[in-house]
């Protein structure tokens, strides 16, 4: 399979898909491999046509989308492919991840992939940076020889094994990918022979090229978008420039057809649209018994026991826990003891070379580990205030899942919760820096069929939510949950009704004009119950 961080390069992918016959039915019907079909593809891509309902009027998009055969991520935000590629393939699978040199400036989470990759539970992951030396408005640091050489040294310090090659030559890509795969296999062999230990030197391709290579404006800011100085349809000079540079890229039809037929003649390989990463459909998880009770405790203890039991009941599903640092503080000590931090050199019984807990003080990196683990079971827990830093990565996955559903090919990955705890009602001691409700409020604006926002009040109401969360496909849940000890508000039956209906009347009294007291979450419910008593005393 493939992953591309630069989603706006989708035009090249769509063109290759057409040439190789790697298309979904809606594209195959509209874009045949002939002059008319190719012309229609080019015209549609720049038409920005809209249907009556506001959706795109053609099966194309500005970025990788569910109509793009083999596409698994939009690539709308630079930097997230870098954080996800090592966690995407399962054992026996192979993934090539095309990355951006501009995204290398985004953050350092991408440096840690050798720390997380394990041959025992990960497939082959081959990152390739397209080092074209430019972002949108200016040259990148990697656009200089000194910057590129410094980046190679940086990669080595992070545990990568950099391999530079000519990014202007398609054959060089093939050779480089083969070489990278051989190097990784050799390192795994040395690991098995106890010559090496984790982290293994992870091959990292650097395709040195020029932005806009082969066309007018190459190597300049103009290469980002439409490099011609004017529209060739209306301006003679622009038309001459277009014809001059397009002529150098033109391939004679018979030669192009022969090359396409050669690709089509290869047997025994699935089309990219049918690769396992694009068709994730893990088995429905076996549900563990639910341990309801009626005594006061941290609501998080329900999740702590449930997730450990769920993982044990489903050894065929790879677990990942995203942890920005305080798993034990957030009352998930059982999860930590059972699954342990993934490290290279364990220093306690809570750490293991093969741990399933991805821990880093980088919220985007740890949530990306779970967003990428689409063939397994996932859990992310963080202080509510720090969840805000996950929002962009989460929205990218939600948008793609919603588009998959609209295209008639819904996502098959199993749902899981993003837990916002140590929340605003609990964090007064840390003042406003730790009191931020942005995350759940923003997710309330997402479509309900791909995101639920849930505010359970106690152990039982949180526990009753979990089976459906983990059985639903292509849908995440934001759980805002207290971590301190809280009373048991609900019986088993009430908790299950609340999980099913979304709201529950807990008390009613008095006559006359009703006064509604509405609570969301544990602390509000306590205060509303106190308020109800006092209002009743006043005859309200």
Q: What do these predicted ranges mean?
A:
Residues 1, 8, 23-58, 69-75, ...:
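Long, compositionally biased, glycine/small-hydrophobic-enriched stretches that function as flexible linkers
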Residues 1-119, 144, 333-335, 364-373, ...:
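Cofactor-binding active-site loop characterized by glycine-rich and histidine/acidic residues
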Residues 2-8, 53-74, 100-104, 166-170, ...:
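Active-site nucleophile and cofactor-binding loops and adjacent substrate-binding regions
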Residues 2-3, 28-34, 91-98, 128, ...:
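Beta-strand segments within the central parallel beta-sheet cores of soluble alpha/beta enzyme folds
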Residues 21-25, 260-412, 473-475, 485, ...:
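Non-catalytic terminal/interface segments that mediate subunit docking, oligomerization
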Residues 24-32, 117-128, 157, 345, ...:
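A glycine-rich helix N-cap at a beta->alpha junction
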Residues 57, 400-403, 433-438:
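Flexible, small-/acidic-enriched active-site or ligand-binding loops
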Residues 61-257, 431, 435-540:
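Glycine-rich ThDP/TPP pyrophosphate-binding loop and its adjacent helix/strand module
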